């Protein structure tokens, strides 16, 4: 089974490098130099030349605020390029495993979102990701779409690494406390994707849309406090004070859903992979970052 991962330099892509190494050692990894998703005219030809049987799309335009000024670019990567990949898969009966986002929801819920919940993205980023999901469904290809949320890892830019950087620079931090989500360790998300590959290979997969995210509904403030509690124990510099603030006190160009926690129970029931243990994920990240700093 020839597997291709698109987006090998991102948080998920780098985590997949580790998770796929032993069970699927022949996996091919493409970064942006190997396949630039903004160049729509070359995507189909590149895929046809390689001939993958399974494509894991771990790449996306994820600059949530910048997307408000770069609508065309966000749509090109998150909708049009995804449509090209799905079209290839449909033509050759390949499988597409695609990662989407909690930002397809408006945040009006009060319980974790299930897959059948109504979508209503509030910004360009969420709208572009939803359009990508729709393009996959319209293609008719065999697919798995995994919506996830608040991804963090030792790699790239993410909330955990931002908190550690700011915590080492400032005595006091203010963090939004009225946005609720499900922090997801990228290593767990990678393992969840690996868990789908056995039924994919055996042709006995329940295709469709799934949620996979952290096992709790917490605020950014609570997330930050847990990061700093663990970081202090491991010898990282942390702020003296972390203040809880409202979204209105920290305006951003793109609106964020006030509630975007995801219910992973469908995925766990089908594929047997438990939802991400976000606290354990923080521990793993901090240990890795501590080793990198030595």
Language model feature labels by segment:
Residues 134-181, 187-195:
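NAD(P)-dependent short-chain dehydrogenase/reductase
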Residues 3-20:
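N-terminal Rossmann NAD(P)H-binding glycine-rich loop of SDR-like oxidoreductase domains
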Residues 69-97:
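NAD(P)-cofactor binding segment of oxidoreductase domains
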Residues 154, 179-190, 210-230, 284:
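Substrate-binding strand-loop-helix patch
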Residues 277-294:
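Amphipathic terminal alpha-helices
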Residues 76, 81-84, 104-146, 150-152:
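Catalytic helix-loop patch of NAD(P)-dependent Rossmann-fold dehydrogenases
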Residues 40-79:
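NAD(P)H-binding glycine-rich loop region in Rossmannoid oxidoreductase-like domains
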Residues 199-251:
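Mid/C-terminal beta-alpha module of Rossmann-like enzyme folds, strongest
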């Amino acid at each position: 089974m020839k597997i291709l991962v698109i987006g090998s330099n991102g948080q998920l892509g780098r985590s997949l490098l580790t998770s796929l190494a032993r069970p699927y050692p022949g996996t091919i990894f493409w970064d942006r130099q190997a396949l630039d998703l903004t160049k729509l005219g070359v995507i189909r030809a590149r895929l046809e030349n390689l001939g993958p049987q399974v494509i894991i799309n771990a790449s996306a335009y994820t600059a949530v605020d910048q997307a408000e000024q770069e609508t065309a670019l966000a749509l090109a990567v998150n909708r049009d390029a995804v449509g090209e990949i799905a079209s290839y898969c449909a033509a050759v009966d390949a499988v597409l495993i695609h990662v989407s986002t909690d930002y397809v929801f408006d945040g009006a819920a009060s319980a974790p979102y299930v897959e059948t919940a109504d979508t209503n993205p509030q910004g360009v980023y969420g709208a572009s990701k939803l359009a990508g999901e729709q393009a996959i469904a319209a293609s008719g290809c065999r697919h798995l779409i995994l919506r996830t949320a608040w991804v963090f890892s030792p790699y790239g830019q993410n909330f955990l690494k931002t908190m550690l950087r700011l915590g080492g620079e400032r005595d006091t931090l203010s963090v939004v406390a009225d946005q609720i989500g499900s922090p997801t360790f990228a290593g767990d998300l990678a393992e969840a994707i690996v868990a789908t590959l056995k039924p994919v290979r055996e042709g006995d997969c329940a295709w469709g849309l799934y949620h996979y995210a952290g096992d709790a509904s917490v605020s950014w403030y609570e997330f930050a406090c847990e990061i700093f509690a663990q970081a202090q124990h491991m010898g990282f510099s942390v702020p003296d004070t972390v203040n809880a603030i409202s979204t209105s006190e920290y305006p951003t160009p793109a609106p964020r859903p006030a509630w975007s926690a995801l219910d992973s129970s469908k995925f766990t029931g089908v594929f047997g992979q438990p939802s991400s243990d976000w606290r354990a994920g923080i521990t793993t990240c901090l240990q890795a970052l501590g080793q990198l700093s030595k």
